Every structure is written in C-alpha cells, then in structure tokens.
Amino acid sequence: MTAVEATPITKEEQSKPLALRVGAELVGSFIICFAIYAICSLGSAVYGINMAFIALLTGIVYAAVTVIFGSISGAQFNPAVSVAAMLTGKTHVLDGILYIIAQVLGGIGAGAAIRFLLPTSEQVTFKIWMTPTVNGFDKNSVSYSTLGNYGVTLGITLAIAVEVVAGIIIVASALRTTDGHGESKTNHAVAMGLAYGNGTAITYPVTGAALNPARATGIAIFAQNQGLNEEPLQQLWVFWICPVLAAAVVALVVIVAGMIGTKKNVPDTVETIDEVEGNTVLGEASVADGNDGEQDEQSYAQANADESVESN
C-alpha cells in the first residue's frame, strides 16, 4: 500500500469549492423562487388552481431542486436553514453568510424575471398577477378578497404563528436529514419536499406561504408600488423574523439535546475506565502469583539437589 492510499481523505478535502457551493445556492434559489412565482401567478390567475395544488407543487419543486444540488451545497436554499446550520456547527459562519446572500440574490433574480416576463394590458395589470403571489397578511392576505366581505381579516398574530410553526417543521427536517458537515443524506430531498408542502398547506391561506425569506423578498421588491392593498416591503420583516426565530428554536433544541447526550455518555466512559484499570490490576496480580510459583518451584528443586549432594 502506498503512502497516498494509506492516508484517509478528510471531509474537508471531499467538500466542494466554496464558489461552487455558493453558485449552487444561487441557481437553486432562483429556480425554486421562479417556479413558485409562476405557479402562484399564472396558475392562480389563469387556471384558478387551489391551495392543495400549490402545496403539492411547492413541495415537488423543493424536492426536485434538492436532488439536483444536494450533493454540492447541501441544498439549503433558505436563510432560516442556513442560520440553523451555522448555529449548530453544520456550516461555517462565512459559508452560511455567503449562502444567504446567494439565496436572496436568487430570489430577487427570479422576481425580476417574473416581473418582466408576465404580460400586462389595461385590463390585466401587474396587480392581478401579484395578488396571489406576494406574501402578506391582513389586507394583503390571499384570503382577504373572500373573508373581507364578511368583515374578517387574517392579521399579524396569526401570520406570525403559522409562519413560525411551519418554519420549525422545515428547519428541523433540514437539520435531521443532513450530516455533521451539512451535506445531504439519502432522504433529504423527500423530507424537504414533505416539509415545504406541509408548510405551504399551513400558511398559504394566511400569508401566501412565505416559508423562506428569499422567496418573500424576491417578489416583494418588484410588487412594490403596483397598487396592492398594502405595500409588500412594509410587511416583509415578518417573513424574515419568523423563519429566523424558528431556526433559533430548532438550533437551541439540537444543542441542548447534544449536551444532554454527552453528559449521559460520561458515566459509561468512567465505568469503562474502571473496568480496564481493574482488569489491569488483576492481570498484574496474576503475573505476580505466577512469578511467586516459579520461584517456589526453583527453591524446591535447589533443595532437592543439595540433599542429593550431601547424601553422596
């Protein structure tokens, strides 16, 4: 075996270059956000697809893009997931910050593409496309046109509650299906598809299913000043605070659970050390007894020899 073959390859040596990983987060986020914007705008306005289809398609999009880029960057595609990965040590802080920047730029790029690709006219304004696409609450909720007629609005408290709960599901699924270095396990894509699909079903009637600060930011910028009931950028802070809060909660649970697990392993280690020391003492005692026995035999043989000499 050569020296090269005998040297194990470390995880750091196996990881992809940082530029490649950041590029994967950028392109992956662009594809995800563009697909979701298209589903919500074209699908809702033209075909009137319901929440079930939006939830299903959102989950499929995240799962598919995770399969494509999971082996490169770990397929985070969400600033909340990146924050949790940094807090738990799965991702280096510098890498995580660059991931977040790439994710937001991907969302903005997707928002720009949708803004300039969707057709408009005097009858079909950009507002019609954006109403089911932009994330918001109260008068900007996708349910406002229906519930508003009955004097009911879905306000900020409900928006925060559903976004935090959905964020916890997504972040926990991401951490559970990535290894200690943030790389995807075999079931990562399926888990993320299910998590985002479930999160969409929970949040879409209230907020339009932000779930991802990059997704909310990308479309909010280009929907600003387009005649919506409320300006999207004024409500955008909710869709950053809630996912990051969810990330912090999940990361705290993971860290505390790890500390508890470490403490439980300490007594086992002490017992093992005691057993080893005990076995060592017993072994030394056995060796000593064996040496004493040999010395007794030698003394007995010497005594017999002396008696034989005297007899002669």
Q: Where do the PLM segments sit?
A:
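Membrane-interface helix-loop junctions and terminal tails of multi-pass membrane proteins
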Residues: 1-312
